[in-house]
Amino acid sequence: MLTVPGLCWLCRMPLALGHWGICSVCSRAARTDKTLCPQCGLPATHSHLPCGRCLQKPPPWQRLVTVADYAPPLSPLIHQLKFSRRSEIASALSRLLLLEVLHARRTTGLQLPDRIISVPLWQRRHWRRGFNQSDLLCQPLSRWLHCRWDSEAVTRTRATATQHFLSARLRKRNLKNAFRLELPVQGRHMVIVDDVVTTGSTVAEIAQLLLRNGAATVQVWCLCRTL
């Protein structure tokens, strides 16, 4: 699937093993060196304890796993994936996220999910783009982790304004009742997968929907968290 098989997407040097698209040196360099809160994913004093923000007002999910801030070297790749139809990049980015998940499992005992779900696009946007980037991240993750993924588990009930230019308050209002759950999640350990989490409004709305319908736990996994 890679356009130049065996070359790293970031440094363009030959890969020593495999054809995942990002070499081990760049994989390590892409990870943030900041200490992040394990619950909200924002900079914190400790990486094993919830930050003060989460103690006062916890988000509607238990854990957030992210690779890095939304900045180079990952941000250009994510932009290519979403807006330049470079869907072949998705496997390389999924592997970065997988490595971060496995690291969190080794170091903090991260719970692996029963099911992972994508953040859905509105039908027209999905049609224009030709794919949902969250789906492309979920496909290999579900295979590698041996957990269920269904692209139709959560759907959008209506079109929403582009979140990028909205304040946090308007983002929350924009997304209210914008999602519908299509599958039972009672007692399930769920993970929401997205490419970038900014204010967290989108994943918060979906997490609340899952918890209202009986999900045991909810995590958020993303490539980048705007720090």
From Swiss-Prot:
Domain of life according to the entry: Bacteria
Signal peptide: none
Gene name for this UniProt entry: gntX
Function of the molecule: Could be involved in gluconate metabolism.
Family, per entry: Belongs to the ComF/GntX family.
Gene3D superfamilies according to UniProt: 3.40.50.2020
Pfam families tied to this protein: Pribosyltran (PF00156)
Protein name: DNA utilization protein YhgH
